[in-house]
């Protein structure tokens, strides 16, 4: 059974130590994102999912800014994006066993 628009699942927030864990849902009831907030800003590891339940992205926030390695899954490709203070530093893409650099921003 799927959820109708009127039965859409509301986000869930739970306190875990000094962080607030957040779970957001797609309109079909599947998890859309799981992550943490600190001082009302995204902080720590975040994971995003497609409506099918398959992982679409994972990465790290520090005080609301994307930082470090992020991975994005699209069809048969894995895209790695390196962030520093919410700015893209480097992008790599893998297609099966082939790796190629897409962009470097230094």
Residue ranges of predicted features:
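Glycine/tyrosine- and acidic-biased, solvent-exposed loop/turn segments at the edges of beta-strands
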Residues: 2-106
């Amino acid at each position: 059974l799927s959820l109708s628009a009127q039965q859409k699942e509301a986000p869930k927030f739970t306190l875990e130590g000094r962080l607030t864990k957040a779970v957001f849902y797609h309109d079909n009831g599947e998890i859309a994102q799981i992550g943490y907030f600190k001082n009302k800003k995204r902080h720590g590891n975040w994971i995003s999912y497609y409506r099918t339940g398959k992982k679409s992205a994972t990465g790290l926030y520090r005080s609301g800014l994307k930082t470090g390695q992020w991975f994005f899954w699209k069809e048969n490709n894995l895209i790695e994006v390196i962030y520093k203070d919410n700015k893209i530093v480097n992008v790599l893409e893998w297609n099966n066993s082939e790796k190629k650099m897409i962009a470097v921003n230094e």
